[in-house]
Amino acid sequence: MKAIKIAMVGAALVWSASAYAAGDPVKGEQVFKQCKICHQVGPTAKPGVGPVQNNVVGSKAGSRPGFNYSDAMKNSGLTWDEATLDKYLENPKAVVPGTKMVFVGLKNPQDRADVIAFLATQHGQ
C-alpha cells in the first residue's frame, strides 16, 4: 500500500513537471494578451494597473519596484516558480486572499502552462 502511494505521488510530480515543460511560449504570448490590460512585458515595460512581468519567474511576490502591492501580496512569502504561478493564475484570490488582482483566473491548465512558458522568456528591467 505504501509503495502504491509513493508511486502515485511520483507519477503526479512527473505529470505536473511535464505540464510545465509542455508550455508553449508562442501560444502563451497570445493568451497573455488578456493580461496586457493590466500588465506589461518587454524592455520598455512600466508598472500600470498591475506590476511589470519581466523576470517574474523566480522572483519574490510583492517585491517588484515601482508598484504598490497589497499587504496580502507583500506578506504572502511566495516565490513565483512554475507551480506557484500555476496555482495563482488558476485562482488568484484563493492563493493570496486580499490580492488587488481582479482577474478571476485561467481555468485551462494548458493556457496557464503556456503563459508561464511565455513569462519565463520575458527578461529586462
Curated annotation (Swiss-Prot):
Pfam families: Cytochrom_C. GO terms for molecular function: electron transfer activity; heme binding; metal ion binding. InterPro entries: Cyt_c-like_dom, Cyt_c-like_dom_sf, Cyt_c_1A/1B. Gene3D superfamilies: Cytochrome c-like domain (1.10.760.10). The keyword Electron transport applies. GO terms for biological process: photosynthesis. It comes from the Bacteria. Binds 1 heme c group covalently per subunit. This is Cytochrome c2. Cytochrome c2 is found mainly in purple, non-sulfur, photosynthetic bacteria where it functions as the electron donor to the oxidized bacteriochlorophyll in the photophosphorylation pathway. However, it may also have a role in the respiratory chain and is found in some non-photosynthetic bacteria. Residues 23-123 form the Cytochrome c domain. Heme c binds at C35, C38, H39, M101. Keywords: Electron transport, Heme, Iron, Metal-binding, Photosynthesis, Signal, Transport. Residues 1-21 form the signal peptide. Belongs to the cytochrome c family. PROSITE patterns: CYTC.
